[in-house]
Every structure is written in structure tokens, then in C-alpha cells.
């Protein structure tokens, strides 16, 4: 099976600038609304607030006003389904099933511990910043403050318009005829549902044996 690149990154040392958006650049895309309407623009999806951004005629970057009415987004042949206020990318649609991935960054304010000579001694974190700049809005903490940033990828198994967290039970729900075989395959291959390559192995097995 042919898989799209999921842009998977190591969670421990990631580049905040490169992961602020799902796409590397704003690209022509289409927003599909629940009422059937479509809008086309230069689009991207922000990983901090999980909202669609677009660039208007004045080259300003804006948030889609009626975000709650979005059903799906297409950007450069990549499809993102809206599910529970998240954008889940369908990586490899095969018939009516697919593996999905949701990417996001958590930003948590933290307190610095004052060390020798009055210098801040930061507690361990994935990544630290003194401020976060988001489309012209800069969020700052008090003097000496910082953010703990962590990049996350959550995986799903999708069928039609249904999206389920990737786990043994939900794979069995999608492929009921393979229920026992899935249990054996997961155990024998030590399937890790927090790892995309591992999930792809199980998905490919199900597609080939359904």
C-alpha cells in the first residue's frame, strides 16, 4: 500500500517554528462546510489552537470566522476531517477506511526556579520559550516566565464518516470478520498504538486479509 508522509517528528526535540502549522507553507486549499458550501484560499491549520488560517487579498493571515461550521479541509491533495473540534488527516484512504492522525502542540505556563546569582534555573521541559507569537498576537508571561511546549500526534482508525481512536477494539469494530486474527496479530507483533509505523503494519494486514 502507498502511504502519505505523516510528517512524524520526534517529540523530544522539535522545531517550534516548523510545527506551528501542519503544512510547511500556506497552500491553495478548499474548506467544506456542513451546509455544502465551499471556500477556496491559501490555507493552513494551526497546531496551537487547532484552527484553520487563511491569507486574504491584503496578505493578512486570518482565522475562519465560522470555524464551528467546517466539515473538512482539503490542502494540496491532503484531506483533514473535522472531528470533535480536531482536524484528523486521513493518511491513506483505501475504499472507505483510513488511518488518521491529529497533530497539536500544548503550551503550558511554568514557573522558573531562581538559582545562583539570581539567574533563572528552568525545570526540565520538552522546549521552553519566553513568549509565543501567534499571527501577530504575542502571549507573554511575567518576567522570568516561560512555556513548556510539547508536540503530540494522536492516531485514529476511520471508516466512512466515523473516526475512532486507534486501538485493538476499534480495529476489530472496523474489521469484525478479522476479530480473532487482529488479537493474535497485535500480540505477536507487539503493536504500539502510539506509533504510526506500528499502526500502519496492522492496518495493512487488515486490508490484505479482509
List PLM regions with ranges:
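N-terminal secretory signal peptides
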Residues: 11-61
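Short hydrophobic/aromatic-rich motifs at helix boundaries and adjacent loops
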Residues: 1-2, 23, 153-156
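Short acidic/polar alpha-helix capping motifs at helix-coil junctions
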Residues: 3, 15, 146-150
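Bacterial Sec-dependent N-terminal signal peptides
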Residues: 1-12, 202
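A short, solvent-exposed beta-edge/loop patch
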Residues: 139-206
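Short alpha-helical interface patches
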Residues: 22, 67-85, 168-180, 187
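Aromatic-patch recognition
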Residues: 39-163
